[in-house]
Design a protein with these regions (language model features):
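Short acidic/polar hinge/loop motifs at secondary-structure boundaries
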Residues: 110-138, 157
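N-terminal periplasmic "start-of-domain" segments of outer-membrane beta-barrel proteins
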Residues: 31-64, 91
Length: 277
């Protein structure tokens, strides 16, 4: 019995000594895309109703209308447009709650007006072209920005780094003399460290409502430094909007006569605003 046990022990040692470790990644280098982790986004296990929308889906719908209009296919979402064409002054309600109770963040930074808690999408024409992904949370969610998140939260992440250079020109045309022209570019990774990208857009529309034209311009510029585990981004974006006011309502008689009426109060009733972020 002792001889059998000794032989078995000897054989097991021999088999173990024959194992060889093979390193399949030795001498190779893998460059991975950036990953931005945001604690204010809900996960699958979170007890929150939410929808994730990615660039591919937004790109198919992005023909010049404001971002809220592109989200009107989501559950519990209702959108509004002063000019009636989805361009200019637009709004979004989630579960019927006031837009002032919908918290908007861009790269984790609150975008709501700090006084009124409103979000003026007219100041972000064609911002959809610079969005990588967004998450809409219905009801109270994971936002850290207080009362502005009672109704809903929309968390927006802007474009990722492009590994390769590109240049893109796109144009679209639609009803009510609506036109969108966009130029986008990226240098790609320079010396495997730097990347610069940008977008310039011009949108025009006569609007569905009488005289409710929109003349919109915007830009988005991004500079990135990426080395090792260090990622630094500098982002600037702004819009310039000229819109004829069309927020007054109509009586039932006016609606029956001409649904496109726009009450006249004074000459050249135009909003001309140019904020910078």
């Amino acid at each position: 019995m002792k001889r059998i046990l000794l032989a078995a022990f000897f054989i097991s040692n021999i088999l173990y000594s024959q194992e060889k470790i093979i390193d399949t990644v030795q001498g190779t280098k893998q460059n991975l895309d950036e990953v931005i982790v945001k604690g204010i986004r809900a996960k699958f296990s979170s007890p929150i109703s939410y929808s994730n929308i990615y660039k591919e889906k937004l790109k198919n719908k992005n023909l010049g209308q404001d971002l809220p209009i592109l989200l009107n296919f989501l559950p519990s979402v209702v959108t509004t447009s002063d000019a009636g064409a989805g361009i200019g002054y637009t709004g979004i309600r989630v579960r019927g709650v006031s837009p002032q109770s919908t918290n908007i963040t861009i790269n984790g930074i609150p975008f709501n007006d700090p006084e009124s808690m409103g979000t003026f999408w007219v100041n972000l024409p064609d911002f959809t072209s610079s969005v990588q992904s967004l998450q809409l949370q219905r009801g109270i969610g994971t936002s850290t920005n207080g009362s502005g998140a009672f109704g809903a939260s929309i968390n927006i992440l802007t474009d990722n780094i492009s590994q390769t250079p590109y240049a893109e020109i796109s144009s679209s045309f639609g009803s009510f003399n609506t036109r969108k022209n966009t130029i986008k570019f990226s240098t790609g990774k320079i010396n495997d460290v730097f990347e610069f990208s940008g977008r310039f857009s011009k949108i025009d529309s006569d609007g569905y409502i009488d005289r409710a034209f929109s003349d919109l311009k915007s830009y988005f510029i991004q500079g990135t430094y990426l080395k090792g585990s260090t990622l630094i981004k500098a982002i600037s974006f702004a819009g310039h909007e000229k819109t004829y006011q069309s927020w007054y309502g109509l009586t039932m008689d006016q609606l029956k006569e001409n649904r496109r009426q726009n009450p006249y109060t004074y000459e050249n009733e135009i909003d001309n605003y140019k904020p910078v972020s």
